[in-house]
Amino acid sequence: MSEIRTLGEFIVAKQHDFPHASGELSSLIGSIKLAAKIVNREINKAGLVDITGASGEENIQGEQQQKLDVYANDKFKAALEARDQVCGVASEEEDEAVAFNKELNQNAKYVVLMDPLDGSSNIDVNVSVGTIFSIYRRISPIGTPATEEDFLQPGHKQVAAGYIIYGSSTMLVYTTGNGVHGFTYDPSLGVFCLSHENMQVPKDGNIYSINEGNYIRFPEGIKQYLKFCQESKPEDNRPYTSRYIGSLVADFHRNLLKGGIYLYPSTQAYPNGKLRLLYECNPMAMLIEEAGGKATDGEQRILDIKPSELHQRVPFFVGSTNMVDKVHAFLDEWRD
């Protein structure tokens, strides 16, 4: 039997990657791990208790909040505030960033941005959902409340990013800039165990993930790329396979393991794209680049975009390097 390495043990062993770290980042990820266990427990019994469905409230984007969105947001926020490594949190579910006011929190080095429950509308049909998180070092002075500028940093400033996928098994996948590592939750032991070390996305793939129901509203370059994907060319492994779950974490996770591309382009309804730069695109972009892939908005690298507002949206193309490059070629050829 091979040695079991838990998430906590792995993080401690990797602390030498941060010569100036004193354990705060490791403890911060421990807070995320704790909240993930709590949310996972609630998701697993969602069909048995009155926690699925709409809460009756809307978030800043005008989207109907699900009850579990609110629950997950509260649990992650509470777990992060309870320890002294985080001075503030920005969430897709909150209009503004939240600065933690306790003195210990104001002395913290980090801020966290999160989508507490991505794909939550799928819960009542038992489809995988997830949590996405992003960690930055604050730029405001230590000992003062966090400011909005702490959160409006380009993605290449992230010190860590990751996601938790709640599915047939629950996994936590994260990077601190030294590889992408996945941990599977063992409910009998109550721990996340290392199951996927140094994850790498294949340079090529044959899976494309896009909501083809929006086809008539896509830019011409995307329409032409989809035709390319569907053409029969056995010599270069086409036609490709269409796989779209409607949960970013689930689609991303599959493509990371098998090779593929996830596309959410601009549409007539969402000319700037629909996905949030800070809560979804930046953390996934850091992960995919660490795994050897690419992430762009169709024109530039996602991690180079300087955000102008907390809930900024962008088009998003992420996955295997050669597939992202091919999308760019079509967008360039058919650009207005």
From Swiss-Prot:
<keyword id="KW-0378">Hydrolase</keyword>
<dbReference type="InterPro" id="IPR044015">
    <property type="entry name" value="FBPase_C_dom"/>
</dbReference>
<feature type="binding site">
    <location>
        <position position="115"/>
    </location>
    <ligand>
        <name>Mg(2+) 1</name>
    </ligand>
</feature>
<feature type="binding site">
    <location>
        <position position="211"/>
    </location>
    <ligand>
        <name>substrate</name>
    </ligand>
</feature>
<dbReference type="GO" id="GO:0005829">
    <property type="term" value="C:cytosol"/>
</dbReference>
<dbReference type="GO" id="GO:0030388">
    <property type="term" value="P:fructose 1,6-bisphosphate metabolic process"/>
</dbReference>
<dbReference type="InterPro" id="IPR033391">
    <property type="entry name" value="FBPase_N"/>
</dbReference>
<dbReference type="InterPro" id="IPR020548">
    <property type="entry name" value="Fructose_bisphosphatase_AS"/>
</dbReference>
<keyword id="KW-0460">Magnesium</keyword>
<feature type="binding site">
    <location>
        <position position="280"/>
    </location>
    <ligand>
        <name>Mg(2+) 2</name>
    </ligand>
</feature>
<feature type="binding site">
    <location>
        <position position="274"/>
    </location>
    <ligand>
        <name>substrate</name>
    </ligand>
</feature>
<dbReference type="GO" id="GO:0006002">
    <property type="term" value="P:fructose 6-phosphate metabolic process"/>
</dbReference>
<dbReference type="GO" id="GO:0000287">
    <property type="term" value="F:magnesium ion binding"/>
</dbReference>
<comment type="pathway">
    <text>Carbohydrate biosynthesis; gluconeogenesis.</text>
</comment>
<feature type="binding site">
    <location>
        <begin position="118"/>
        <end position="121"/>
    </location>
    <ligand>
        <name>substrate</name>
    </ligand>
</feature>
<feature type="binding site">
    <location>
        <position position="92"/>
    </location>
    <ligand>
        <name>Mg(2+) 1</name>
    </ligand>
</feature>
<dbReference type="GO" id="GO:0006000">
    <property type="term" value="P:fructose metabolic process"/>
</dbReference>
<feature type="binding site">
    <location>
        <begin position="262"/>
        <end position="264"/>
    </location>
    <ligand>
        <name>substrate</name>
    </ligand>
</feature>
<feature type="binding site">
    <location>
        <position position="118"/>
    </location>
    <ligand>
        <name>Mg(2+) 2</name>
    </ligand>
</feature>
<dbReference type="Pfam" id="PF00316">
    <property type="entry name" value="FBPase"/>
</dbReference>
<dbReference type="GO" id="GO:0042132">
    <property type="term" value="F:fructose 1,6-bisphosphate 1-phosphatase activity"/>
</dbReference>
<protein>
    <recommendedName>
        <fullName>Fructose-1,6-bisphosphatase class 1</fullName>
        <ecNumber>3.1.3.11</ecNumber>
    </recommendedName>
</protein>
<comment type="similarity">
    <text>Belongs to the FBPase class 1 family.</text>
</comment>
<dbReference type="GO" id="GO:0005986">
    <property type="term" value="P:sucrose biosynthetic process"/>
</dbReference>
<feature type="binding site">
    <location>
        <position position="115"/>
    </location>
    <ligand>
        <name>Mg(2+) 2</name>
    </ligand>
</feature>
<dbReference type="InterPro" id="IPR000146">
    <property type="entry name" value="FBPase_class-1"/>
</dbReference>
<dbReference type="GO" id="GO:0006094">
    <property type="term" value="P:gluconeogenesis"/>
</dbReference>
<comment type="subunit">
    <text>Homotetramer.</text>
</comment>
<keyword id="KW-0119">Carbohydrate metabolism</keyword>
<keyword id="KW-0479">Metal-binding</keyword>
<dbReference type="InterPro" id="IPR028343">
    <property type="entry name" value="FBPtase"/>
</dbReference>
<feature type="binding site">
    <location>
        <position position="117"/>
    </location>
    <ligand>
        <name>Mg(2+) 1</name>
    </ligand>
</feature>
<dbReference type="Pfam" id="PF18913">
    <property type="entry name" value="FBPase_C"/>
</dbReference>
<feature type="binding site">
    <location>
        <position position="244"/>
    </location>
    <ligand>
        <name>substrate</name>
    </ligand>
</feature>
<keyword id="KW-0963">Cytoplasm</keyword>
